Amino acid sequence: MARGLPTIASLARLCQKLNRLKPLEDSTMETSLRRCLSTLDLTLLGVGGMVGSGLYVLTGAVAKEVAGPAVLLSFGVAAVASLLAALCYAEFGARVPRTGSAYLFTYVSMGELWAFLIGWNVLLEYIIGGAAVARAWSGYLDSMFSHSIRNFTETHVGSWQVPLLGHYPDFLAAGIILLASAFVSCGARVSSWLNHTFSAISLLVILFIVILGFILAQPHNWSADEGGFAPFGFSGVMAGTASCFYAFVGFDVIAASSEEAQNPRRSVPLAIAISLAIAAGAYILVSTVLTLMVPWHSLDPDSALADAFYQRGYRWAGFIVAAGSICAMNTVLLSLLFSLPRIVYAMAADGLFFQVFAHVHPRTQVPVAGTLAFGLLTAFLALLLDLESLVQFLSLGTLLAYTFVATSIIVLRFQKSSPPSSPGPASPGPLTKQQSSFSDHLQLVGTVHASVPEPGELKPALRPYLGFLDGYSPGAVVTWALGVMLASAITIGCVLVFGNSTLHLPHWGYILLLLLTSVMFLLSLLVLGAHQQQYREDLFQIPMVPLIPALSIVLNICLMLKLSYLTWVRFSIWLLMGLAVYFGYGIRHSKENQRELPGLNSTHYVVFPRGSLEETVQAMQPPSQAPAQDPGHME
């Protein structure tokens, strides 16, 4: 038995390492980066991340092939669904005004390993997303010049037919990424100025499209003669919602930039709300005028807006639309390349990624090494790869990040607030970490509840009715309820997505299983709602927690389950690569690991003796607090 104890202890220690949290420090406003971004800067950064190629490509494709004129309803529902995730990011961005976005939010609430995996996937999302936008930018510009750029490259450089590779090397896409990376490395102010310029042009072009589009509108294009407003029915609207949801994924760049915001606790929630409203308004208005200008079934899915003006005889307007699309894609590219090195910087600053990427240039106050290194990597991928097959891969990483952030909001709301640390002789140093194996759940006999319950405790008003939940330590019931909620959310998603097509459930079995899982889901929400939460009047907080984060989780799970199995296979391979990096480097170099080095912590592992409670409590006391021995027994 004694030989097994070290193995059990080592496994327990490993689990402790994997789930250790990054502490929320009081000095969250101190940073090596330059806090220079205003609310307007953050808002335009978010608008640039959302209103890009999707407006000029996705709108026409969904209208023609999925939803018809009802695409505007698809965008409206998708905007509401995105708002659920955006609210979670807004609260975290105000509460933790540091760079890192979903990675950091997961680190402070759920644990180190989960945070690393989320950060690892967000990195890939930005890299592949930047390369895809650059190739779309190159292709759109090439089409304006009758594909002369592609023809020249294939003639003088060559082409190939290799799986996962493009038909020809896209030097233009690689070049625009390198140029954008150079501007981003010059500082946040330079990037913000460029983003302002391109965003202003893009918004003016959108305004032009809406005004001229309403002038040219022909309401009979929504009539029954043309197929009606919703030719694909309700199912088409919902299928369009799944596609349109990805048009709003750019708001997380605001949270990733919160460490450079002048007043993040106010600016981040405000910028997320305003940018999402602007993006939703732009998508809904443009899809409305597009389907009113020409019949939805005559749209060109590759360049719907420009082609619509061509069909109405306004070729000059088509060139304005093409110029606006180029500017819009520039804003998306700048937003992605601006956020990418900041995620790398956050992970490197925490010791989970290579330390060279934590270096901040003293003059520009930006992580130049990460900007240039990952800019080169993105350019290389854009040069060679055919990224169409990896688009769904981006969706999976984004949805997974949304799910973890929503879960983190619930976890953090029911955690006990950290008392502010005061510097002094009695305070532990910056590399000191105090832990206990079970003292977090220890309550002395005879302790009564305080007048103000702690987060995670049962609400006093409900104790007469739910007293059977009151005998547990704060947070214990919440943890179980959260686990049941997540399990039931996954089951609901599986039933909705696979119930008829894959599982081949009979109708009564489908309804029964969906009803049972929904009841479990609602009961877990009621149990969570019966417990005390953190309330901060000085910060933005989401209303209706845990309902809003829970709805976001269910939606994200359903969308993830709709992705192809090849996407999950590629995702698993990427996760394995991330685990190799974490266990090979991150777990040993983590800053939290440095705080736990021998001599820098005060961790006490307790083995319960076969004695009374009094003996157990005495055994837990540190040596300095042990009762003095009888002088007669001293040697």
From Swiss-Prot:
Glycosylation sites: N151, N195, N221, N500, N601
Gene3D superfamilies for this protein: Amino acid/polyamine transporter I
Main location class: membrane
Matching Pfam families: AA_permease_2 (PF13520), AA_permease_C (PF13906)
Cell compartment(s), UniProt: Membrane
Sorted UniProt keywords: Amino-acid transport, Glycoprotein, Membrane, Phosphoprotein, Transmembrane, Transmembrane helix, Transport
Residue(s) carrying Phosphoserine: S422, S427
Single Gene Ontology BP annotation: amino acid transport
A molecular-function term among this protein's GO annotations: basic amino acid transmembrane transporter activity
Family annotation (InterPro entries): AA/rel_permease1 (IPR002293), CAT_C (IPR029485)
Domain of life of the organism encoding this protein: Eukaryota
Role description: Involved in the transport of the cationic amino acids (arginine, lysine and ornithine).
PANTHER family to which the protein is assigned, alphabetical: CATIONIC AMINO ACID TRANSPORTER 4 (PTHR43243:SF4), INNER MEMBRANE TRANSPORTER YGJI-RELATED (PTHR43243)
Protein name: Cationic amino acid transporter 4
Organism listed in the record: Homo sapiens
Lineage: Eukaryota, Metazoa, Chordata, Craniata, Vertebrata
